[in-house]
């Protein structure tokens, strides 16, 4: 055994004299000394081998010249498509950028080439949002006017050579070919509003050219209210919600109910007469209110 001696010869003789025998098994101190010796040998040799091999690999990596195909790919690529200039890459010999020219070009073309499926999905989402807004808002609501105003989005490539302009206006679509790519886009009118304008600017500035915006001039004048209506009668009915005026009185004998809108009076008057003009198409049931008929129609779906 390669064990460091922890006792002298005199200590061993004294141990034999006192106990009558000498144990051949190593003690805890001898085991600890052996472990320290093995660790010291390991730490002196093993890291030196790793450092030598790592240094050799590092020297080969730093001093290796880049392949000529990579240099040609850097020269042929547009400098705007690369985050660093090709001249800097040539000067710094310590940096070896391993890029595949075909892979880089294919990824660049894929990122710059809009597919027809993505454009169709974009148009379908806008159409679905427009249908949801029109079905949930009354015809004179200002939220509907915001979504009916044409919204445009410009998709430009990195180098600025190919520009696709998408204008969604009520679902009138046509096919436009730009750079050999067929894209579904809307027809832009002659007086189209620029895409940089906001919704309020489009509603106000485009009122001269778009006939629909000319109608939306009836705005509520009360503080904090931004309601916009296409008809003056709708605006007057809305303003009565601020003033509390109820000019429509029920003419039924003994009824003192008053209403701010004429349709509310008509709906109330059916309670006296018992009229039910709204009939279900699937059954024989009739209703006095259209919203009650709509709730009933959901049962047949």
Swiss-Prot record:
Domain of life: Eukaryota
Protein name as it appears in the record: Krueppel-like factor 7
Gene3D superfamilies: Classic Zinc Finger
Organism lineage: Eukaryota, Metazoa, Chordata, Craniata, Vertebrata
Motif Nuclear localization signal per UniProt: ranges: 214-219
Matches recorded under CDD domains: KLF7_N
Keyword presence, Methyltransferase: no
Localization in the cell: Nucleus
Keyword Nucleotide-binding tagged: no
Domain notes: The acidic N-terminal part may favor interaction with the basic domain of transcription factors.
Source species of the chain: Mus musculus (Mouse)
Function text: Transcriptional factor. Plays a critical role in neuronal morphogenesis. Represses the corneal epithelium differentiation. Acts also as a metabolic regulator, by modulating insulin sensitivity in pancreatic beta cells and skeletal muscle cells. Inhibits transcriptional inducers of adipogenesis and has a repressive role in the expression of several adipokines, including leptin.
Sequence motif 9aaTAD, residues: 93-101
Family: Belongs to the krueppel C2H2-type zinc-finger protein family.
InterPro entries reported in the protein's UniProt record: Znf_C2H2_sf, Znf_C2H2_type
């Amino acid at each position: 055994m390669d064990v460091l001696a922890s006792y002298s010869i005199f200590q061993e003789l004294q141990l034999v004299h006192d106990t009558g025998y000498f144990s051949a098994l190593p003690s805890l101190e001898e085991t600890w000394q052996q472990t320290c010796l093995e660790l010291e040998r390991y730490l002196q040799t093993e890291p030196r081998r790793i450092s030598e091999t790592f240094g050799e690999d590092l020297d080969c990596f730093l001093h290796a010249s880049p392949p000529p195909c990579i240099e040609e790919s850097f020269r042929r690529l547009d400098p705007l498509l690369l985050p660093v200039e090709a001249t800097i890459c040539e000067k710094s010999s310590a940096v070896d950028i391993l890029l595949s020219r075909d892979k880089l070009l294919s990824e660049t073309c894929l990122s710059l080439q809009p597919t027809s499926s993505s454009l169709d999905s974009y148009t379908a989402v806008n159409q679905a949002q427009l249908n949801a807004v029109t079905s949930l808002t009354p015809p004179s609501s200002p939220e509907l006017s915001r979504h009916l105003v044409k919204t445009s989005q410009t998709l430009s490539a990195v180098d600025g050579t190919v520009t696709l302009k998408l204008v969604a206006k009520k679902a009138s679509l046509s096919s436009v070919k730009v750079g050999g790519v067929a894209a579904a886009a809307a027809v832009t009118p002659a007086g189209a509003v620029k895409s940089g304008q906001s919704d309020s600017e489009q509603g106000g500035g485009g009122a001269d050219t778009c006939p629909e915006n000319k109608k939306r001039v009836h705005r509520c004048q009360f503080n904090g209210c931004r309601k916009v209506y296409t008809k003056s009668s709708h605006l007057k009915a809305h303003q009565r919600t601020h003033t509390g005026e109820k000019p429509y009185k029920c003419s039924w004998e003994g009824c003192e109910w008053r209403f701010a809108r004429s349709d509310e009076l008509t709906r109330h008057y059916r309670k006296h007469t018992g009229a039910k003009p709204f009939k279900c198409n699937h059954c024989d049931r009739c209703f006095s209110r259209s919203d009650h008929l709509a709730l009933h129609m959901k049962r047949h779906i």
